[in-house]
Structures are given as structure tokens and as C-alpha cells.
Amino acid sequence: MNTGIPKRSARMDMGFYALNKLASAGIVVLLLSLLDWAWPSGADQASEWLGLYMPQEHWVYGYALTASLAADAILTFLPSLHKGKQAAVYGAVGFLFFALFTGGHPEQLWLRAAAGTLTLLLFLWGKHAFSSNSLATPFFALAVPLLCWVI
């Protein structure tokens, strides 16, 4: 039975998936930039607390995006899960990824892991919030990170 909805190709689905991930990263970059603008010494203070001294772009696009892709890969091997269980998987991946792979001082392990969990939960929110037919998706994927970088 034809429902009138055209079927998309696998390439188009992958493109929308990538755009969704970039939009989620854009939200995280925007929130970190707003925190940096509202509290100018906050970025240095947060880096000191976490024991990491890297630009926020590396944190978001290097670590968080990779961890989000790993969480999605794990979710593909599991049966369909409710949003709460998806959040648990994302949180666990964020916790482990940021605790184990970001280096830094071991004293800040729990803070890094908690920050990774919160960051990945924002990626999960973006996964559900950004749709393929919304203009907000390309805006947050492309325009917001560029504006945050320029300003």
C-alpha cells in the first residue's frame, strides 16, 4: 500500500543522521559559548576543575561527537529501547568515554565523567529534537557553530 510518503535513499538517511549529529554538537557549542560569555573566567575555571586544557571545539567535535557515535553503535545492537534506557546507554558511554579517554589528572576523573555524561545527554536530546524536515537542524548544524567561533 502506498502511503504517499516518498521513500528516502540510504544515502539521504545517512546525510540526515550526520546533520542531526552536527546540530546536536551545535547546541552543545552554543551552550558552552553562552557559559563562556556570561562567565568569562568560567572556561578557565571549568578547565581547571576538569583537569583538561583544550578548546571547547575539541571537547565537542573530537570527544563528544565520537562518544555519541559509539553510543548509537551500541544502540543498534540492542533491541528497541525506550527513551529512558537510551538515556542510560548514552550516559554510560559518556561517563566511560570521558573518564577513560580524555587523559588529564586522575583526581578530576569523576568531574570529567559527569561532564561527559551531561554532554552526551544533550546529544541524545538533539537526536530526538532535531528532525529532518526542520530548518532548525541545518541552522544549529552549520550557522550556530560558525557564529560561536566568529564571535
At which residue positions do the language-model features occur?
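Disordered, low-complexity tails and leader-like regions
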Residues: 1-2, 113
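Membrane-associated alpha-helix detector
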Residues: 2-101
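Final/C-terminal transmembrane alpha-helix of multipass membrane proteins
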Residues: 134-151
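Membrane-helix boundary connector in multi-pass membrane proteins
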Residues: 100-136
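C-terminal TM-helix exit segments that contain a strictly Trp-centered aromatic cap at the helix terminus
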Residues: 35-36, 100-107, 148-151
